Amino acid sequence: MADLARLTALIEPEAKALGFELVRVKMMPSEAGDGGQALQIMAEDPATGQLLIEQCAELSRKVSDVIDAAEESGEVLIEGAYHLEVSSPGIDRPLTRPKDFADWAGHEAKVSLVEKIDGHRNMRGILLGIDGETVTIADNRAGEVSFALEQIHSAKLVLTDKLIAATQPLDADGAEEVLEDKEEKADD
């Protein structure tokens, strides 16, 4: 178990000090294959909507330091071992903040609701935007549906050609080395 509210309160000032905005702080199963858990932190540079690898590394160091300091003073933020994962939200990013629903209006999204509306819990269609705390989507099956932000269990963009065109990568430096490393590990 983790105190996500306290973790967010510790992490957000560190992200802001670097000029970044938090997109999500979440505990999830680790991708390390060890059956453990991971503290996933997604952040973005508001100017680009992305983070470079160097920016992720810088935020990771800051977050590690602030969590270590809190735990050394006796706080229990996360029970048990965990991995820290800091990343950019990616192209098919989660939609977690009101501004996400405004910024990505016109793009296809998948939304899972806490409770059914008009017989549907899962929706997929064009995000029409947000008005106050009410999100509207043109669902492929149910038509235009509106619901409160608090009714959303999860939401994310769907990878489409339109979305790819709207989110060009900032920097591909080092990408070939990463691919080569993966190929070498696969050959081992």
Swiss-Prot record:
UniProt-listed Pfam families: DUF150_C (PF17384), RimP_N (PF02576)
Keyword Cytoplasm among record annotations: yes
Recorded superkingdom: Bacteria
InterPro entries registered for this protein in UniProt: Ribosome_maturation_RimP (IPR003728), RimP_C (IPR028998), RimP_C_sf (IPR036847), RimP_N (IPR028989), RimP_N_sf (IPR035956)
Major location (coarse): cytoplasm
Coiled coil: none
Record GO biological process: ribosomal small subunit assembly; translation
Keyword annotations: Cytoplasm, Ribosome biogenesis
Gene3D superfamilies for this protein: Ribosome maturation factor RimP, C-terminal domain (2.30.30.180), RimP-like superfamily, N-terminal (3.30.300.70)
CDD domains, A to Z: YlxS_C (cd01734)
Gene Ontology cellular component list: cytosol
Protein's cellular compartments: Cytoplasm
Function: Required for maturation of 30S ribosomal subunits.
Family: Belongs to the RimP family.
Entry protein name: Ribosome maturation factor RimP
Species in which this protein is naturally found: Erythrobacter litoralis (strain HTCC2594)
